Amino acid sequence: YVFLMHDDAAGGSGLDWEPYLSRLREHGVFQGGSTIGEGQCERKSGSTPAPTAHITGFIRVTAEDMAHARDLLHGNPVYEAGGTVEIRELPNG
């Protein structure tokens, strides 16, 4: 699963990530992540849409199912500050 953090949390860039990331590592579910900077969309032909501007970072986790992934949100600084975290399944294969 991947958590996509949106930029609507109170506190913005001042959020403390280390306790949350440490807990995910301790439970063996952390698979990586990063902040996301500015970018651009490319398309071979036709008009190109603007890149999604409100996603500021991602975290990959191992989870049994969507319910387990939701449980792993507890302690996520964006989630705890009232911001939006989008959960997406990363299909195997």
Regions found by a protein language model. Give the residues of each.
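Conserved, structured core segments of small domains
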Residues: 1-93
